[in-house]
């Protein structure tokens, strides 16, 4: 950056001196040089300051934001680079309460997300895409152990016990399309908060329409046409290969059931239908 400014300054100085050659009465070479220098500095003092300011502004890091969202800044973030998207539900009464929580603090400390999707479909952006929001907490997905550093966090205004509004899901799909396109995130890389932390999180709830999302091209869904898993297929190894942490197998099975079977009441193990689903997912 300093080299560019030096080059431009020398060019401006040279041009100014050339334009002033031959004017005025004869003087010694040294005095002419001093007068020319003074003239140049007077002529270019303010334009040069402006030029330097503009160049510095152009080279500065720019926060990445979505054109679909209302910017409502949260101070709770750091810098990072996203490769995956984590979906949450807010488990709060309304979007204003969620905005307060995501911009200040809650009983467990400061939290934030990049986006919040209201029940009416309005999208709020709280943290720039290139910044590290504090939404995932401890957990793991596949080989990723710091999900905050690797992900975009999207909170969805929902109390956890009600279906998600159609306008809200439509807005979410538009947002996913925008974010995946701009940040070059693979469209299959959309997971639940409960997927990465099954022992402590259950969001989004069983009411979340994962199949609808997959039909729109985001996330993954098993093919209905796929038959049973082959003999010898190990569903637990498959669950781990898919990305789920197995520190607590019962919790991992529960998170899987919630996402792919829409159930919270199944036994905390993996049955033949789970094996079929996992085999289908891993073969895609």
Language-model segments: which ranges?
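Residue-identity detector for glycine
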Residues: 3, 22-24
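Intrinsic-disorder-associated, low-complexity terminal segments enriched in Asp/Asn/His/Tyr and depleted
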Residues: 6, 14, 37-38
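Ala/Thr-enriched low-complexity intrinsically disordered regions
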Residues: 7, 16, 28-30
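Bacterial N-terminal signal peptides that target proteins for export
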Residues: 38-48
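Bacterial N-terminal signal peptides
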Residues: 47-57
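Basic/polar, cationic surfaces and motifs that engage anionic cell-wall
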Residues: 59-62, 165-284
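Active-site-adjacent loop/helix surface patches within enzyme catalytic domains
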Residues: 62-78, 83-84, 91-188
């Amino acid at each position: 950056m300093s080299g560019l400014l030096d080059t431009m300054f020398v060019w401006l100085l040279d041009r100014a001196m050339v334009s002033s050659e031959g004017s005025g009465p004869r003087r010694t070479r040294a005095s002419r040089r001093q007068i020319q220098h003074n003239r140049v500095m007077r002529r270019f003092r303010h334009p040069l300051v402006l030029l330097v300011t503009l160049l510095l502004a152009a080279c500065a890091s720019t926060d990445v934001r979505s054109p679909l969202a209302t910017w409502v800044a949260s101070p709770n973030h750091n810098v990072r680079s996203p490769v995956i998207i984590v979906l949450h539900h807010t488990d709060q009464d309304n979007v204003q309460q969620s905005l307060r929580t995501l911009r200040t603090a809650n009983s467990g400390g400061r939290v934030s997300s990049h986006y919040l999707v209201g029940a009416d479909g309005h999208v709020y952006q709280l943290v720039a895409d290139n910044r590290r929001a504090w939404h995932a907490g401890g957990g793991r997905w596949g080989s990723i152990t710091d999900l905050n550093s690797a992900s975009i966090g999207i909170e969805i205004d929902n109390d956890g016990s009600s279906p998600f509004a159609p306008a809200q899901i439509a807005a979410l799909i538009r947002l996913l399309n925008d974010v995946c396109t701009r940040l070059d995130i693979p469209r299959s890389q959309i997971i639940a908060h409960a997927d990465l932390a099954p022992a402590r999180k259950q969001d989004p709830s069983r009411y979340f329409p994962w199949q609808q999302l997959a039909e729109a091209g985001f996330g993954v869904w098993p093919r209905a046409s796929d038959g049973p898993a082959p003999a010898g297929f190990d569903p637990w190894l498959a669950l781990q290969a898919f990305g789920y942490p197995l520190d607590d197998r019962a919790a991992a099975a529960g998170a899987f059931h919630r996402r792919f079977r829409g159930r919270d009441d199944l036994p905390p193990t993996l049955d033949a239908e789970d094996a079929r689903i996992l085999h289908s997912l891993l073969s895609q």
